Amino acid sequence: MLTQIINGHILTPQGWMKDGSVLISDGKILEVTNSDLAVIGAKVVDAKGMSIVPGFVAMNIHGGGGFDFSECTEEAFHGAVAAHQKHGATTIFPTVLAPEIGVIDKAVAVCEEMMRKKDGPILGLHIEGPYLNPKMAASLFIDKENPADPKEYKEILERTDCIKRWDSSPEIPGCLLYTSPSPRDQRGTRM
């Protein structure tokens, strides 16, 4: 279905545009034009002078709407995602605080299930921990130093593609090996 949004302030890479329109089909922007002439066959939506902006990418989001991604349940993921979508996020990288490897395993299972859904907003996980310096972890509630175990993290990275970012402290034993180039890094994980 073709939708045309008119009568709004449109944010483009060149700046703000007034008196234009945005054409959308199947949830994707087809065109931004400086004309607000009606497109035949399109459903017209009047923005009533409001701002029209691209969807937001949420890259460091721990939860929302009363839900926390670290709960590692489908209910928590759905609830937090819905809260952020309501406010304009179209792409989400759930951030999971992982004081132990078991939390990562649970988060990966939920994330992989949600990523299987066509046109879903989740594009991968952002993991914080367990290889963080407790003195530098701010409000992350990491209470002990966990040396990075190559067997542990390589096994996780070899079985999933959903981890896109994994935070660690380089001063923790084993973390420099953990961040060295590997085949997994080339598949999309930022360490």
List each language-model region with its residue ranges.
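Divalent metal-dependent hydrolysis catalytic cores, especially in the metallo-beta-lactamase
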Residues: 62, 78-107, 121-134, 160-171
